From Swiss-Prot:
Pathway: Cofactor biosynthesis; NAD(+) biosynthesis; NAD(+) from deamido-NAD(+) (ammonia route): step 1/1. Belongs to the NAD synthetase family. The lineage of its organism: Bacteria, Bacillati, Bacillota, Bacilli, Lactobacillales. Catalyzes the ATP-dependent amidation of deamido-NAD to form NAD. Uses ammonia as a nitrogen source. It comes from Lactiplantibacillus plantarum (strain ATCC BAA-793 / NCIMB 8826 / WCFS1) (Lactobacillus plantarum). Pfam families: NAD_synthase (PF02540). GO terms for cellular component: cytoplasm. This is NH(3)-dependent NAD(+) synthetase. Mg(2+) binds at D53, E166.
Amino acid sequence: MRPLQAEIIKALHVAPTIDPEVEIRRSIDFLKAYLTKNTFLKTYVLGISGGQDSTLAGKLTEMAITEMRQETGDDRYQFIAVRLPYGNQADEADAMAAIDFMQADVTDRVDIQPATDAMVTALEANQLTIHDFNKGNIKARQRMIVQYGIAGEMHGAVVGTDHAAEAVTGFYTKYGDGGADIVPLWRLNKRQGKQMLAALDAPKHLYDKVPTADLEEDRPALPDEVALGVRYDDIDDYLEGRTVSDAAAEKIEAWYLKTAHKRHAAITVFDDFWK
C-alpha cells in the first residue's frame, strides 16, 4: 500500500468491506443520537437531487426521524426534503422518485435560479466576469442558503451527503454542498453506498445512474469521472486499500493534497497542513 494511501484511509475511516445492514443501523443511530443530545432540534433538512448520495442520506434520515417519533411520542420530529432546481432541471423525475422512496414528512421546492442570477448580475455590475464554473459553485451555495433558511425556522439541522469518495478528491463546493451540520455517509465510498441502497430496496436506477454534479451550463450533466479524471471504481479500490494503477493513485493523491483546505475549518496561524 502506498504511504499516503494508508494515511488517507485512516483519516477518512474507510473500511475495506462493510455489512450494509450494520452501516445502515450505525447511521440511523448516529442521526438519532444527535437529536437526543440536542433537544432543541426537531427536524432534519436535506436537499434532494435524485442522485445516489442524497437518496441514501434521505432514506437514512427518514428512518431515524420515524424512530425518534415512535420512541419519544413527539410528533414535532420531522424530515424535510427540499428540491432545489435551477429553473427546469433534467433530473426532476429522478428527484421525485427519490422523494417517493424515502417518504419525507415534508417536501419543499425552491427554485434557486432567481437568486443565483441576481447574485451573478450584482457581481458583474462590479466589472467582474463570472465564469460558468464559478457560477456553478454559486448555485451550490445558494442551495445551502435555502436549506439553512428552512432549518433556522424549523428548529432543524442540515444533513450533508459528503462521503469518502468525495472527501478524498474534494469533489464538492466549499460552503456549498460541503457545508452541513451532520454527515451520516462519512466513512463510506461510492461502492459501499450502493450496497446500502440495494439493502434498502431503493430503485436501482437512482444508484446505477452516471454520477454528475450538473452545476455547469457549458457542460451540462458532466460526469463526475470526467471532471475528476479518474473512475469511481479506482477511487473505491484505493480507499479500500487495494492496488490501483500508478496513474489513478497519483490523480487521487493530487486531488487530496490540492483540496486539503476543504477538509479543514478556516485556516488560522496555528495550522500548518497547508505549508
